[in-house]
Design a protein with these regions (language model features):
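Membrane-proximal intracellular helices of multi-pass ion channels
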Residues: 1-481
Length: 481
């Protein structure tokens, strides 16, 4: 494998990230040259210089292997997280080395967890940088880099095995460059529409843009310590529910529906399961909250119950209430939603509705085969017959996913973190959800937790964002031969 070629492509990603740092510095300058201006400007120059070295000294090549392409994807994520710490470390404040790494990984993986006790105390430029990391991460660092790497788009690089933000392997099969165009149109369009709607609902331009970027990236970063609860607006909640739910749908399906290539978005079996789960889960939580008299009005219970459930299923992590104070039944449903999550081909993390549907179909098929041993039963998803290898991959992924949650839980308890915090933190981190329960609840943060716990959860974030095996494979020596 040609490491220099991989470094060249990763270098382009670094330069692209440097542009967002420069844009954040511009926001800082417009805001009166706040204390983040020079840290952001210096970080931009440093990142651009580091990215320029391989571009200058490594000759451009038109062909790369699948293994090299794989390393471009994983390497871009890791490097993005590393250089993403620069503005935090140079600015200082609450950002120690561990805290800066955690915040950067949380942003680029669109997890949305934070170590900040007072988000509102951040300079506006640094605030915008946090949202830039999550917005870039939502689409995928590599996807953005492909916009300026047309040569890479002509190669047979299978991103859908590694890069979670690309279109899933189903009946939407496009060349890489067309995938980028589809993702960009849907992503930017949804962000713009959400920004305008939030502004009309009463937010200022900065808050509306930042929350739209966060919602469309299914991240959950907020400009306020109390998250969306700060605004206390049913209209804003409704707009964000729409944005989050839409961002959790397969982007290729959204594009096909909007352009008329597909007549009805509800024709997708996975989408029906996903939207049905959102409504059913939100309604069950509503009934639980109303019956427990946590909210005396049914409309208030429905507003908060639906919002929180949509927020965790789409792995966004916004909050309109402190779910630590809710019923045990509501907590169980929220944890279930944090594990299952939204559709493949979206910006969400987690196991994905697609895999859940296939797992249930496999169980049903197994029961039918016990009744009819000689029957040949095909499993279909959205009309496409699923190969045996693909079905095995689904079950292996689910088992690995649950084992990592268990490992993260045990690891946290070893270092003195209580069971609920360890478990929900592991679920929220590997699913890129953000908030959990206990000390990492929807109105809390990771600041008071041990540094080793923050590092283990940042590792879970990367594992979840890179589909587990995409990251683990790098540590097998035979793979590099």
């Amino acid at each position: 494998m040609r490491v220099d070629v991989v470094l060249r492509y990763v270098g382009v990603v670094m330069i692209f990230i440097a542009l967002f740092m420069l844009l954040s510095a511009g926001i800082s300058y417009v805001s009166g040259m706040d204390s983040a201006f020079y840290p952001l400007l210096l970080s931009s120059l440093l990142t651009a210089l580091l990215g320029a070295f391989p571009l200058i000294f490594v000759e451009r090549t038109e062909q790369i292997t699948n293994k090299e392409g794989f390393c471009v994807v994983v390497g871009s994520w890791l490097v993005a997280c590393v250089v993403g710490t620069f503005p935090y470390l140079i600015w200082g404040g609450e950002f120690s080395l561990v805290n800066a790494w955690f915040e950067s990984v949380s942003g680029f993986t669109t997890t949305g967890s934070t170590i900040l006790n007072d988000v509102e105390a951040l300079p506006r430029g640094l605030q915008f940088w946090r949202f830039s990391t999550t917005w870039v991460g939502g689409m995928g660092v590599v996807m953005f880099a492909l916009l300026i790497l047309p040569s890479l788009g002509r190669n047979k690089l299978t991103l859908s095995n590694v890069e979670l933000s690309t279109l899933a392997k189903d009946n939407y099969r496009y060349r890489t460059q067309i995938i980028v165009q589809i993702l960009l149109v849907v992503y930017v369009g949804l962000t713009v529409v959400s920004t305008l709607l939030l502004k009309m609902a009463g937010m200022n331009w900065f808050d509306s843009l930042c929350h739209a970027m966060s919602a469309c990236a299914t991240s959950g970063f907020s400009t306020k310590n109390a998250s969306v609860a700060y605004f206390n607006s049913p209209m804003i909640d409704t707009i964000l529910i729409f944005a989050m739910a839409t961002a959790g749908i397969h982007f290729g399906l959204i594009y096909a529906t909007v352009t008329g290539k597909r007549s009805n978005i509800f024709r997708s079996e996975v989408t029906r399961w996903y939207l049905g789960m959102l409504f059913a889960g939100g309604l069950l939580i509503t009934v639980s909250l109303y019956a427990a008299d946590i909210y005396p009005a049914f409309t208030s219970a429905f507003r908060h119950g639906l919002f929180q459930f949509v927020s965790v299923v789409t792995t966004t992590g916004f909050a309109t209430a402190d779910s630590n104070q809710w019923t045990s039944f509501a907590v169980i449903l929220l944890i279930f939603g944090s594990i299952v999550c939204a559709c493949a081909g979206s910006t969400a993390g987690g196991i994905k509705t697609n895999r859940l549907v296939l797992a249930m179909k496999m169980m049903r098929t197994r029961l039918r085969q016990q009744q009819h041993p000689n029957a040949i039963i095909r499993i279909r998803l959205d009309g496409v017959i699923q190969e045996t290898e693909a079905l095995h991959s689904v079950m292996i992924f689910i088992v690995a996913y649950l084992m990592l949650i268990l490992a993260g839980t045990v690891f946290g308890t070893i270092f003195g973190v209580d069971l609920m915090t360890s478990f929900s933190g592991a679920v929220a981190s590997i699913g890129n959800v953000g908030p959990g329960f206990g000390e990492v609840g929807s109105m809390d943060n990771f600041s008071a937790l041990p540094g080793v716990f923050k590092l283990s959860n940042s590792l879970l974030m990367l594992l979840g964002r890179l589909e587990i095996f995409g990251f683990i494979q790098l540590f097998f020596i035979k793979w590099w031969r």
